[in-house]
């Protein structure tokens, strides 16, 4: 018999997270490392666990994640998005609660491109009167 698992893909900035929810006791493993060793900052760990805490499913699923691209914040947001999508696959009645919290919406904000004639996306070269 196949093991029950729920898959979800999350994205944020340049990060892509492939999330699997497996019935378990609430262990979160990211790229074969525990969440405590992968994310040093407590705020990033809180972001990852938000959907599980909101729906009260923290102790019902083990979360297995493969994430690549981007930085820490983008990866945390991508994991949260992936966990949310997987939770909705596991139980459709959680959708309104997660939608209201804004976890189902893909954050569209991306890095603005650098324009020629400027130092960065908006930073102009220093102006000199003389």
UniProtKB/Swiss-Prot annotation:
- Biological process (GO), any one: translation
Task: Give start-end positions of Basic and acidic residues composition bias.
Answer: 99-110
For this protein, the record's InterPro entries field holds: Ribosomal_Su5_D2-typ_SF, Ribosomal_uS9, Ribosomal_uS9_bac/plastid, Ribosomal_uS9_CS, Ribsml_uS5_D2-typ_fold_subgr
Pfam families in UniProt: Ribosomal_S9 (PF00380)
What keywords sit in the KW lines?
Ribonucleoprotein, Ribosomal protein
Question: What family does this belong to?
Answer: Belongs to the universal ribosomal protein uS9 family.
Q: What protein name does the entry list?
A: Small ribosomal subunit protein uS9
The opening ranks of the lineage are: Bacteria, Bacillati, Bacillota, Clostridia, Eubacteriales
Q: Encoded by which gene? A: rpsI
